[in-house]
């Protein structure tokens, strides 16, 4: 499986978490890392080049900090410009069958992203617009990787999160349907029945 990680951090050099993730992913087999904000500091996106990169990979990872309950501005612009009508949707199926994974860092702690928490909603609820975008372009939206509390994380916690992210995005059973099929097969192989 060929994995593409598009990194949308507007100031990657000052980042602690996303920069550590990039370092880890750049040495991970079958992973291509593209730093989109560094590629397009002027905001002029090379749409054919971006479409070609997407087409050449099976699993598409969108890595970014969580900004105002959404994505950084260039990621929104990138989606608007790259997922063109007739190519990604509206009769176009260039991304059909590919897998979509979000890799997100948040400043707030995990317990703030739930009913009753100070952010009021779960991360799953905040990601609905991206999930629907993934659905529209016929990709399979897989479980996201979310690292909460980046603001207060220690260097050891950040490095651990980088290793966990690499394991997450390269997991061949990240797709819940594949994981379920493997579980059922293992049960059958062991003679277990429910």
Residue ranges with predicted function:
Residues 16-20, 45, 73-77, 156:
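Generic recognition of short, well-ordered alpha-helical segments
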Residues 4-6, 32-34, 61, 101-103, ...:
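Hydrophobic/aromatic beta-strand patches that form the interior of the parallel beta-sheet core
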Residues 32-55:
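N-terminal beta-loop-helix "entrance" segment that forms/cooperates
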């Amino acid at each position: 499986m060929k994995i593409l990680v598009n990194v949308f951090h507007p100031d990657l050099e000052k980042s602690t978490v996303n920069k550590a993730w990039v370092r880890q992913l750049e040495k991970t087999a079958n992973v291509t890392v593209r730093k989109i904000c560094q590629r397009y500091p002027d905001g002029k996106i090379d749409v054919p080049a971006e479409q070609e990169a997407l087409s050449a990979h099976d699993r598409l990872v969108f890595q970014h900090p969580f900004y105002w309950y959404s994505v950084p501005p260039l990621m929104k612009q990138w989606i608007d410009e790259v997922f063109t009508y007739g190519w990604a949707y509206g009769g176009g199926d260039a991304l059909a069958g590919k897998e979509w994974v979000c890799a997100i860092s948040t400043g707030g702690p995990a317990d703030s992203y739930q009913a009753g928490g100070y952010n009021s909603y779960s991360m799953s609820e905040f990601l609905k617009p991206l999930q629907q975008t993934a659905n529209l372009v016929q990709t399979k939206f897989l479980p996201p990787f979310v690292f909460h509390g980046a603001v207060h994380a220690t260097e050891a916690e950040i490095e651990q999160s980088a290793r966990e992210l690499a394991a997450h995005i390269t997991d061949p059973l990240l797709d819940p349907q594949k994981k379920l099929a493997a579980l059922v097969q293992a049960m059958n192989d062991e003679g277990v029945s429910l």
